């Protein structure tokens, strides 16, 4: 792609579509912002406080008599847990800012491995006092090779300095990483440690961790 604004929108929408499918596959309900302001996705997943695990709603099946006196079979989705049948389902909420990078071919490694340069733009506006806010940075190598780096906005501090002037005044601090097809970050920084990206990669499980903001009372 040429890098125009239109191309960036296309790759951005592609990344969001791929991420939405991955989240849906893992049981999340995915809602996209109607107006593009702060967060791209709001995702929900039902959690049973009684079972203390993620559960879907119970679909009750039974028979009933219709107006003509005929016996019919029917089913309805209830508000109850599918396992314990208690009214104990709560919705876990996560807010996600999605970033997608297509990458620019870079210099190969000494072993001849192909590498691309990807840029991640952290923005201070997303660094709120709310642990339910996450970044999903999507590395698109090609159609068959897509990696997802999932982390809290506060985790930017693990690989960048949030106090530098450019981050505080321009709202657009760029981190450029050399990444191979498998999604391994090859940067070896002296000021910053990029090993955190190994923990971030395909870290969809972190979205399910119960955190301080998950208060239903």
What do these predicted ranges mean?
Residues 1-37, 43-217:
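Mixed-charge (Asp/Glu-Lys/Arg
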């Amino acid at each position: 792609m040429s890098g125009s604004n239109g191309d960036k929108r296309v790759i951005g929408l592609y990344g969001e579509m791929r991420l939405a499918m991955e989240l849906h596959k893992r049981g999340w309900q995915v809602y996209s912002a109607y107006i593009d302001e702060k967060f791209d996705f709001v995702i929900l997943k039902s959690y049973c406080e009684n079972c203390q695990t993620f559960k879907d709603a119970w679909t009750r099946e039974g028979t009933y008599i219709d107006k003509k006196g005929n016996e019919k079979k029917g089913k309805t989705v209830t508000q109850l847990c599918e396992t314990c049948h208690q009214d104990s389902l709560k919705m876990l909420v996560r807010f996600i800012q999605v970033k997608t990078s297509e990458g620019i071919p870079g210099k190969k490694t000494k072993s001849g491995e192909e590498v691309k340069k990807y840029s991640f733009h952290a923005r201070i506006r997303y660094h709120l006092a709310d642990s339910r806010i996450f970044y999903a940075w999507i590395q698109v190598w090609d159609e068959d090779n897509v990696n997802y780096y999932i982390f809290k906005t506060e985790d930017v501090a693990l690989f960048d300095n949030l106090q530098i002037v450019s981050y505080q005044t321009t709202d657009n601090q760029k981190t450029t990483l050399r990444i191979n097809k498998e999604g391994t970050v090859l940067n070896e920084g002296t000021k910053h440690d990029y090993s955190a990206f190994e923990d971030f990669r395909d870290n969809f499980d972190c979205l399910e961790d119960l955190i301080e903001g998950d208060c239903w009372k």
